Amino acid sequence: MKDTFVEKVDDFVRQHDVLKERSTIVVGVSGGPDSLALLYYLLEKRAAKQFEIVVAHVDHMFRGDESHEDLQFVQDLCKGLGVICETIRINVSQYQKQYGMNAQVAARECRYAFLERIMKKYDARYVALGHHGDDQVETILMRLVRGSTPKGYAGIAVKRPFHNGYLIRPLLGVTKEEIVNYCNELKIIPRIDPSNKKEVYTRNRLRKYVLPHLKEENPQVHEKFQKFSMQMQEDEAYLQELAFEKMNKVITKKSDKQISLSIPAFESMSMPLQRRGIQLILNYLYEYKIPSSLSSIHIDKVIEFFKRTQPSGSLDFPGDLKIVRAYEECSFGFKQEIVSPFLQDLSVPGTITLSNGDKLVTEVSEDIPSDMNETVFVAKYNDISYPIRIRSRENGDRMSIQGMNGTKKIKAIFIEAKVPREKREEWPVVCDASGNIIWLPLLKRSAFAISKETAKKDKYMIIHYKSKESSGRIMK
């Protein structure tokens, strides 16, 4: 066991490959004992390790004059130490109201944005923060009590990617008591944030009532929690890699704002990979800015949603994310504007582009296409009244079906084809000038259509559905 604070931190830094020599380090300094201990430790190592050190301080303006005094304290300290000091005052309460988030999340976003800016300014390799071993214990306990993701249960990372470098926490191997003793040895008088003692916060209650009992059982309990954290992170990295590999085979469509997957393929994955697969989707869509109100409960909800017997339904998640199930497919995407009813004339010959980028193209010919698949409609030219009209569906729509007697509801056709509800509003309905529905592209042709078998030499009106995707099934 190392005897001194500096030796213990040295050992931890070496063990976890936290810092490289000849690096620029941005140190987050609040003025409290943790960040001051970190700063003085790095200053002690500066000459031997050839570190360049820049201090960064954020006044969140939560405590009025008191927090402004913290800023002045850090500035004066850095001036005396001959260290570069970058400070900023941010009205976090205003930011919090503007973006609808809790105070702690808002403060963290503002603080990290500032740290990233300073990191860029000085081309720094590291941002160093003063979290210690007791913080690690409290964080893991808090997430176990509240619920979290597997990654969350691993607690605070010693080192993780941040901007073009790393965010590091060299003090995770020491306790709060050791930090305070180190400050006392150096005769450092830190600033104390009174909010750290308010029992309204879960972390503070765990610190006051739970942590002391754990330390009675084992004074080095923080080392056990740190070992647990590292094992969890290693296991999580492996499982994340597996989940990523599996999800690439499960996802059927992907864009910046939407992901669709096959439910049967997803459910063939093991449960640990299912949970991580959902987390990967959420990370991608939220661009890693997960709303604070989102938790492991939401991931469980998605998995339960897939197991329901109802073939369709939806879930609403924070930040206007909507999860829509349609039979064996599920899409995750941000709510879009309601599709407005549309009506457009299509000349013959002519072309129109649909809202999804697909096209309807008409032509007149005495020959019918060799491939009469679902993307083609052919009728005798003189059997159709013009102009051709392309519109959105309407209540009560019915059409005659090629090869059948009577008519059938468009709604029933959509249901039988398992067309998702949100797709039905933008699906093109092709009519003639008399209002007859002559074609529902990709789904059904009307009695006006001719087949390859019944075709004779004649003048034909032909409509092609041309998808922007090669499959020809973009609507589906």
UniProtKB/Swiss-Prot annotation:
Coiled-coil portions: none
Key words of the record: ATP-binding, Cytoplasm, Ligase, Nucleotide-binding, tRNA processing
Top-level EC class as recorded in UniProt: ligase
Catalytic activity: cytidine(34) in tRNA(Ile2) + L-lysine + ATP = lysidine(34) in tRNA(Ile2) + AMP + diphosphate + H(+)
GO cellular component: cytoplasm
GO molecular function: ATP binding; tRNA(Ile)-lysidine synthase activity
Secretion signal span: none
Primary location: cytoplasm
GO biological process: tRNA modification
EC number from the UniProt entry: 6.3.4.19
Binding site for ATP: S30, G31, G32, P33, D34, S35
Cystines in this chain: none
Localization of this protein: Cytoplasm
Protein family membership: Belongs to the tRNA(Ile)-lysidine synthase family.
PANTHER family, per database record: TRNA(ILE)-LYSIDINE SYNTHASE-RELATED
Function of the protein: Ligates lysine onto the cytidine present at position 34 of the AUA codon-specific tRNA(Ile) that contains the anticodon CAU, in an ATP-dependent manner. Cytidine is converted to lysidine, thus changing the amino acid specificity of the tRNA from methionine to isoleucine.
UniProt xrefs under HAMAP family: tRNA_Ile_lys_synt
Descriptive protein name: tRNA(Ile)-lysidine synthase
